């Protein structure tokens, strides 16, 4: 039977090299704080307890993760990783297996960590890297047993050539860690209490020490600056792109796909290059997403098409709908089956019924559009009076002529026609034509100033130029 597990996440670092006012663990990875990714990994292991050791910006860090069931432990002075773990140990029973993670190592997976929990001694997570600069080296004896971890600043030239490095992640019993942490010394180049010195302490009391390797190259990469953050972001995105491809979502250009949340999808879906999916995104069967699209917290049903460079946020697109290109569906938009929203159309808190169309250059806000209604190019629902929003209701099979303004609150009846250029300020009845525009007037002989340098029709008896000045003699 597995011992109960307590996870300790070290998140006290200030992150000076980030050049940011935010604590390092709040830096975003795929749209979420670094620490959130580590917490998700920790909770996936089913621990009895999760402890986060914080320091710089602790209030910010805790507030950003208030929904997580964790214990917050302050490290008042940053005296090293060993000291940080020691701060959390008083709350952990001796019989618990303690897994130590880092808030700036977000790529490690639960599958990699489970073997550390299955051991009965001190289990280390190691990696082989082509350039070990900056890492602590794992030193073995002639029999291959782990004898020490030597930090970069304390390593001699021979030790620095070792390419087997310590990732910093380890597991041991709480009772053992408590004993080892009490014996730590800060007699080193940094003047800190190193957690890695637990190796020597474990060997001294006969506790087995094992080093297990990561299952994926770069999985335990830490983040100290924006360059490394960008590298980890790229690795994260490539990992998810590969998983989505394996799960049946076609990504036309996987290296140009960004996920900042989660996506569920049906069969035969395709996502073109340069698309970004944020929050919770659900794609039905056969959904086609064009290049440069941004999808945020939305549902797109079977057979719908989203054209290039469209933004869809907190919206619901029904089956068989066509949207875009260059459309913007804002929060509260619902398109029912077969509706169409075309290029340079913006919607907000609007419902378009089955088969309704707004194909060009239109704004539909706070509106209910009936089935098969057609909104001509340049139609605007004037929903805001400077203080409050008002709704527009358009009946089924209504036709709104191009360039019309519907001043809410207003209703257009079923099968009504609104003449092009109308400014509608009162309800339009069903089965009727409503026109609200001035008649066109023709002025014979008019020539625009670009042709004549003057306005109005030519007149030999006109003594006053168009500019209003005196006539030249």
Curated annotation (Swiss-Prot):
Catalytic-site annotation from UniProt: 360 (proton acceptor)
Free-text comment on the cofactor: Binds 1 Mg(2+) ion per subunit.
Segments for region (Disordered): 439-473
Residue positions binding UDP-N-acetyl-alpha-D-glucosamine: 10-13, 24, 75, 80-81, 102-104, 136, 151, 166, 224, 330, 348, 363, 374
Keyword DNA damage: no
One GO CC annotation: membrane
Main localization category: cytoplasm
Pathway assignment: Nucleotide-sugar biosynthesis; UDP-N-acetyl-alpha-D-glucosamine biosynthesis; N-acetyl-alpha-D-glucosamine 1-phosphate from alpha-D-glucosamine 6-phosphate (route II): step 2/2; Nucleotide-sugar biosynthesis; UDP-N-acetyl-alpha-D-glucosamine biosynthesis; UDP-N-acetyl-alpha-D-glucosamine from N-acetyl-alpha-D-glucosamine 1-phosphate: step 1/1; Bacterial outer membrane biogenesis; LPS lipid A biosynthesis
Residues that hold Mg(2+) according to the record: 104, 224
Subcellular location: Cytoplasm
Stretch list, region Pyrophosphorylase: 1-226
Pfam families: Hexapep, NTP_transf_3
Catalytic activity field: alpha-D-glucosamine 1-phosphate + acetyl-CoA = N-acetyl-alpha-D-glucosamine 1-phosphate + CoA + H(+); N-acetyl-alpha-D-glucosamine 1-phosphate + UTP + H(+) = UDP-N-acetyl-alpha-D-glucosamine + diphosphate
Domain of life: Bacteria
Molecular function as annotated in GO: glucosamine-1-phosphate N-acetyltransferase activity; magnesium ion binding; UDP-N-acetylglucosamine diphosphorylase activity
One Gene Ontology term from the biological process aspect of the record: lipid A biosynthetic process
SUPFAM superfamilies: Nucleotide-diphospho-sugar transferases, Trimeric LpxA-like enzymes
EC number(s) reported in the record: 2.7.7.23, 2.3.1.157
Span list, region Linker: 227-247
Family per record: In the N-terminal section; belongs to the N-acetylglucosamine-1-phosphate uridyltransferase family.
Self-association state and partner proteins as the record states: Homotrimer.
Record's protein name: Bifunctional protein GlmU
Taxonomy of the source species: Bacteria, Pseudomonadati, Pseudomonadota, Gammaproteobacteria, Chromatiales
């Amino acid at each position: 039977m597995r011992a109960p597990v307590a996870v300790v996440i070290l998140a006290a670092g200030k992150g000076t090299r980030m050049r940011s006012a935010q604590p390092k663990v709040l830096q975003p990875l795929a749209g979420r704080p670094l620490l959130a990714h580590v917490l998700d990994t920790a909770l996936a292991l089913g621990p009895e307890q999760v402890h986060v050791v914080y320091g710089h910006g602790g209030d910010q860090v805790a507030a950003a993760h208030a929904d997580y069931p964790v214990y917050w432990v302050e490290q008042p002075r940053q005296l090293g990783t060993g000291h940080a773990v020691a701060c959390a140990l008083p709350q952990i029973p001796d019989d618990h297996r303690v897994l130590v993670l880092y808030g700036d190592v977000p790529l490690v997976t639960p599958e990699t960590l489970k073997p550390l929990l299955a051991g009965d001694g001190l289990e280390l997570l190691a990696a082989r890297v082509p350039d070990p600069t900056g890492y602590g080296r794992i030193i073995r004896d002639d029999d291959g047993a782990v004898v020490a971890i030597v930090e970069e600043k304390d390593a001699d030239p021979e030790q620095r050539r070792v390419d087997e490095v310590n990732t910093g992640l380890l597991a041991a019993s709480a009772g053992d860690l408590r004993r080892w942490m009490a014996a730590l010394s800060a007699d080193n180049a940094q003047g800190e209490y190193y957690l890695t010195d637990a190796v020597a302490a474990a060997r001294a009391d006969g506790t087995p020490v094992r080093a297990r390797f990561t299952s994926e190259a770069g999985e335990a990469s830490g983040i100290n600056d924006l360059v490394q953050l960008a590298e980890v972001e790229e690795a994260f995105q490539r990992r998810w792109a590969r998983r989505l491809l394996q799960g049946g979502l076609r990504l036309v250009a996987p290296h140009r796909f960004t996920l900042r949340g989660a996506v569920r999808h049906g069969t035969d879906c395709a996502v073109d290059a340069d698309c970004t999916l944020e929050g919770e995104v659900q794609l039905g069967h056969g959904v086609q997403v064009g290049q440069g699209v941004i999808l945020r917290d939305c549902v797109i049903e079977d057979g719908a098409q989203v054209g290039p460079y469209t933004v869809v946020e907190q919206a619901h697109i029904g089956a068989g709908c066509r949207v875009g290109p260059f459309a913007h569906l804002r929060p509260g938009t619902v398109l029912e089956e077969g509706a169409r929203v075309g290029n340079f159309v913006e919607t907000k808190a609007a419902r378009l019924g089955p088969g309704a169309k707004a194909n060009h250059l239109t704004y539909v806000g706070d509106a209910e559009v009936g089935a098969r209604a057609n909104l001509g190019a340049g139609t605007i629902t004037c929903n805001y009076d400077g203080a409050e929003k008002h709704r527009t209701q358009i009946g089924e099979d209504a036709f709104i002529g191009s360039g019309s303004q519907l001043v809410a609150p207003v209703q257009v009846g079923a099968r009504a026609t609104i003449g092009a250029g109308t400014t509608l300020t009162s309800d339009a009845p069903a089965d009727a034509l409503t026109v609200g525009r001035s008649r066109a007037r023709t002025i014979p002989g008019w020539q625009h100033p670009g042709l004549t340098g003057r306005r109005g029709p030519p007149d030999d008896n006109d003594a006053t130029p168009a500019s209003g000045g005196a006539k030249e003699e």
